[in-house]
């Protein structure tokens, strides 16, 4: 049932009224929208959040215009980087009382893994105000082997390669920059290379043995992985603006403890370069 237009014209516009308390809100929007995106030749179903700031003199936002901003641009589907940027700009145009807007798109990205595919998590965001800040977050699982236990076993057995406990570890790289979004595949590669060993979706017995030997020969603490991620990021993305902000983190799902191990470093490119050069 659709209400008559004359009835809608007589109804008050609640959203445009003054609020009881004149307090500005940073973000008001629609979260969990489903949108199609094209990514590296694949058509994927992604989840999107859209929001705008709300001035202190307005009670609510026009939610339908928010949804319209991203749905218009996703038909036909386009790449998530363009969709984020264009939708953030469109939000400010459609809701001109807002002084900032943002769009985030989340999806599982396919990555070639030998004869099969594996997937890693990607979140792409754009925040628009006087300028546009682009942000990307990549999460992928890898394997880490504990060097502390390996050393104890090596001392006991005097062997060249010592047994130790291994675990799946979740590596995270998050980048906020005024430049274009970095390539998520390259970020995923940095995380995998920083681990003791990558994980595989499809393996046969010789492959499994090779992965374990590689992991044991490259035992790393969670702290080692974070530092290696930072080192590899600087090699690959050192050209980004100096005020680019990065989060590098690892959550290790321990096999011999009843808890996880977590390590992170948050930094700007300018900050980390000065720190490294001072040593």
From Swiss-Prot:
Hydrolase listed as a keyword: yes
Broad enzyme group: hydrolase
Domain of life according to the entry: Archaea
Keywords associated with the record: Hydrolase, Iron, Metal-binding
Record-annotated site: May be catalytically important: 146
Catalytic activity annotation: GTP + H2O = 7,8-dihydroneopterin 2',3'-cyclic phosphate + formate + diphosphate + H(+)
UniProt-recorded Gene Ontology molecular function terms: GTP cyclohydrolase activity; GTP cyclohydrolase I activity; GTP cyclohydrolase IV activity; iron ion binding
A Pfam family the protein falls into: GCHY-1
A GO biological-process term: tetrahydromethanopterin biosynthetic process
Cofactor(s) the protein needs: Fe(2+)
Biochemical pathway: Cofactor biosynthesis; 5,6,7,8-tetrahydromethanopterin biosynthesis
EC number: 3.5.4.39
Cofactor note: Binds 1 Fe(2+) ion per subunit.
Entry keyword Hydrolase: yes
Membership in a protein family: Belongs to the GTP cyclohydrolase IV family.
Entries under HAMAP family matching the protein: GTP_cyclohydrol_A
Self-association state and partner proteins as the record states: Homodimer.
Function: Converts GTP to 7,8-dihydro-D-neopterin 2',3'-cyclic phosphate, the first intermediate in the biosynthesis of coenzyme methanopterin.
Annotated protein name in UniProt: GTP cyclohydrolase MptA
Organism the protein comes from: Korarchaeum cryptofilum (strain OPF8)
């Amino acid at each position: 049932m659709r209400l008559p237009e004359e009835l809608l014209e007589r109804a008050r516009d609640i959203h445009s009224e003054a609020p009881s308390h004149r307090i500005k809100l940073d973000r008001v929007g629609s979260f969990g929208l489903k949108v199609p995106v094209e990514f590296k030749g694949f058509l994927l179903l992604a989840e999107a959040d859209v929001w705008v700031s709300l001035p202190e003199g307005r009670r609510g936002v026009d939610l339908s215009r928010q949804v319209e901003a991203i749905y218009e641009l996703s038909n036909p589907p386009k790449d998530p980087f363009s969709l984020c940027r264009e939708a953030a700009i469109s939000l400010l145009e459609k809701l001109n009382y807002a002084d900032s807007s943002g769009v985030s798109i989340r999806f599982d990205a396919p990555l070639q893994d030998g004869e099969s595919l594996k997937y890693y998590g990607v979140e792409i965001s754009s925040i628009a105000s006087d300028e546009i800040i682009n942000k990307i977050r990549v999460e992928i699982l890898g394997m880490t082997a504990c060097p502390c236990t390996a050393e104890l076993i090596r001392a006991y057995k005097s062997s060249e390669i010592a047994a130790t406990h291994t675990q799946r570890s979740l590596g995270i790289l998050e980048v906020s920059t005024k430049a274009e979004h970095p390539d998520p595949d390259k970020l995923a590669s940095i995380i995998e290379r920083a681990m003791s060993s990558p994980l595989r979706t499809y393996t046969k017995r010789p492959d499994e043995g090779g992965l374990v030997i590689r992991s044991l020969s490259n035992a790393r603490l969670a702290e080692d992985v974070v530092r290696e991620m930072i080192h590899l990021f600087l090699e690959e993305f050192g050209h980004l603006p100096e005020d680019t902000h990065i989060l590098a983190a690892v959550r290790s799902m321990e096999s011999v403890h009843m808890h996880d191990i977590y390590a992170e470093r948050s930094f700007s490119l300018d900050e980390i370069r000065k720190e490294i050069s001072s040593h």
